[in-house]
């Protein structure tokens, strides 16, 4: 697993924990740093801050283009994977679009239901197609 893949996984863990505990992701990040000797990779912090900053717009896009699913009905882990993937796809120019989608699908394969990778791939693929108009 590459350093960036590990950073994505760590960011996912922190974002998921924050939502489950109903705390700010930055508060969860701070608690994680205080609890463990593990250094949180700078890219994990970038993801967390990016998802927080762009979260409303990301959720709007996900809600608009997910077919048959509202954000509230999605499994929480899928919701976090999609938020990370959408942030990388739409707002992080350092990550190629295909990599953003592929990495999100891999997280879904490792951590979610059997149907989740297909759902994540389809929704992020749709956002990738619409990217020029979404950010215009």
Segments (PLM) and residue ranges:
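N-terminal interaction/assembly modules
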Residues: 1-136
């Amino acid at each position: 697993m590459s350093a960036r893949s590990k950073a994505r996984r760590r960011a996912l863990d922190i974002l998921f924990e924050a939502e489950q505990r109903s705390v700010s992701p930055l508060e969860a990040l701070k608690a994680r740093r205080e609890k463990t000797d593990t250094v949180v990779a700078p890219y994990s912090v970038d993801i967390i801050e990016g998802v927080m900053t762009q979260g409303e717009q990301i959720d709007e896009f996900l809600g608009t283009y997910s077919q048959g699913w509202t954000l509230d009905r999605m499994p929480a882990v899928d919701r976090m994977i999609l938020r990370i993937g959408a942030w990388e796809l739409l707002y992080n120019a350092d990550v190629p679009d295909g990599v953003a989608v592929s990495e999100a699908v891999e997280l879904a394969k490792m951590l979610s239901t059997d149907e989740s990778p297909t759902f994540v791939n389809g929704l992020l693929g749709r956002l990738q197609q619409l990217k020029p108009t979404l950010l215009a």
